[in-house]
Amino acid sequence: MIIKANGTEISVLLSPEQQNDYISLTDIAKYKNPDDPRIVISNWLSSYSTIDFLAAWETLYNPNFNRMEFHTVRNETGRLVLSAKQWIERMNAIGITSHAGRYGGTYAHADIAFEFASWISPEFKL
């Protein structure tokens, strides 16, 4: 399924097994950087406020969230740099998915995608 927001086409994965739709962060990121949206997503994931939000979401909805690994990453000294794949694998996260290949990309639960969209641009979220 495709939705349009602020003139940008955004893919939505309909996920019957998870009972939630996942919205393409890659497509949203193209609004800011059409050539390399992965950089935009990585920059967002490299913010402490972002990973705190994601951890709160995962704590609410994911009984298998790796809180110990989250605290390890959160308390590491130096600059925080995480890719979507690293976040998913290290935290056992379910709120974000990442798929390689032609029809791949990074997708997130609507709660997370809207948070990302508001980081891109407040108007984009609205």
Q: Model regions: which residues?
A:
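An anion-engaging/catalytic patch
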Residues: 1-126
